[in-house]
Regions:
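NAD(P)H-binding glycine-rich loop region in Rossmannoid oxidoreductase-like domains
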Residues: 35-76, 90
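C-terminal substrate-binding subdomain of Rossmann-fold SDR/epimerase-dehydratase oxidoreductases
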Residues: 167-169, 174-275
Length: 275
């Protein structure tokens, strides 16, 4: 039995990691926010999945969650390994998504603070002299039936209301990765000897457009898709490179979001029929 400490363990990604670790019989601690005992305790293997992205309404909260606590842990914490959960959003409007690619910050990005804090935290990890691994998940999705997340929510709307409102361009495309794939990869990389000091993308490896998602919803629910013409931010994402994670985890086979939407629709219909 290994000791794991999961910061952000009550959040979307963190709770999935905690569930998998507990299911395998590991000793897992999820500290409460502002618990100073984390600096006096042997944390074992740390997975840092805490974070915040509301740059408009809570800029200092974004900094605190993404940087401040992590910096204190790197400087004062007692741990063997640390996995820091960053984001492939740092590749937005770039030509490459290689982990070694040069990165830029876009002045017209209203959430650039998020990218900046992620990059600062990554650099602190690399400069800390500690045993760290940095992972960059793409757009993480879940399929929990009653989740407020984007995909389950629009699936419920398609079935319950026969209508889905889309406030993005039809050709808006990004990489979607299942939360189960992210959690499993984080746990594997946390003990992988060759992942120390590495930055590793966790993604499907291909982009999916909003229209592809809408087409699946329409095909299996016959719902109406309403596209709203709004001024959408300049967000273009290159295809995410996954060669590094495959080299480290040869059996890494990420789920397909379109297939998972189809499964979610079937599950939701079965749930309604049973109730």
């Amino acid at each position: 039995m290994k000791r794991y400490t999961v910061f952000g363990g009550r959040g979307f990604i963190g709770s999935e990691i905690v569930g998998m670790l507990e299911a395998s019989g590991q000793d897992v601690w999820v500290p409460l926010r502002d618990d100073d005992s984390v600096f006096e305790t042997d944390l074992g293997t740390v997975i840092y999945s805490a974070g915040q992205g509301d740059c408009k309404n809570s800029p200092f909260g974004v900094f605190d969650a993404n940087c401040r606590l992590l910096a204190d842990l790197l400087e004062r914490g007692k741990f063997e390994r640390l996995v820091y959960v960053s984001s492939t959003r740092v590749y937005m409007n770039h030509g490459s998504s290689s982990e070694e690619a040069d990165l830029k910050v876009c002045t017209d990005d209203q959430r650039r603070l998020f990218n900046l804090t992620k990059l600062v935290s990554e650099e602190l990890c690399l400069k800390s002299g500690r045993n760290v691994t940095i992972v960059r998940p793409s757009n993480v999705y879940g399929v929990a039936l009653h989740s407020p997340l984007f995909l389950p929510a629009i699936t419920r709307n398609a079935i319950n209301h026969g209508k889905v409102d889309m406030y993005i361009d039809q050709d808006y495309a990004k990489d979607y990765v299942s939360v189960t794939d992210v959690a499993r990869a984080c746990i594997t990389l946390a003990t992988h000897p060759e992942s120390v000091g590495q930055i590793i993308n966790i993604a499907a490896g291909y982009n999916i457009t909003a229209k592809q998602i809408a087409d699946v919803l329409h095909k299996f629910t016959a719902c109406e898709i309403v596209w709203h013409n709004i001024a959408f931010p300049n967000e273009n994402f290159p295809q995410t490179a996954i060669s590094k994670i495959i080299s480290l985890i040869p059996d890494y086979q990420p789920r397909n979001v379109l297939e998972d939407i189809e499964l979610m629709i079937a599950e939701f219909k079965a749930h309604l029929a049973a109730h």
